[in-house]
Amino acid sequence: MDHAGLVCHELVKHPAALRVAVVTETYPPEINGVAMSTGRLVEGLVAAGHRVDLIRPRQPHEGGEPGARAPSSGLDEMLARGIPLPKYAQLQLGLPARQLLLRRWSRQRPDIVQLVTEGPLGWSALAAARKLQLPVIS
């Protein structure tokens, strides 16, 4: 799919570093197909020199309050609030965070937003991206 003039495989080969926002309900160390695929995507983007803004729910095994985490090389992470996923209580379903994302992305505008999962967090990210006229892929 071509949204915003970039095909997904071109993101890795893009000559200028991009700021890519990745919105997902699950991410390593969770073990499932979505988490593992998203982890590899983020690792590949960072290894190629891109900056990743990872937005995901804080999971039960992670202590503390939701919010921004200390950035690591090439990766900024924001933990959103969540609720236990029905019948899969070890994972949190991200709650909507439209206003938080509007503020965050107004300060540090991503070049593109990748919606990995389309739960409440993903839908609120889509609404924020549309309001800011950011390109979105899913």
Q: Where on the chain are the PLM-derived regions?
A:
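N-terminal subdomain of nucleotide-sugar transferases
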Residues: 1-82, 105
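Proline-centered loop/turn at the N-terminus of a beta-strand
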Residues: 133-135
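Acceptor-binding helix/loop patch of EC 2.4 sugar-transfer enzymes
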Residues: 82, 137-138
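A generic "cationic amphipathic patch" detector
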Residues: 33, 65, 90, 123-126, ...
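An amphipathic, basic-hydrophobic alpha-helix
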Residues: 87-112, 117-127, 131
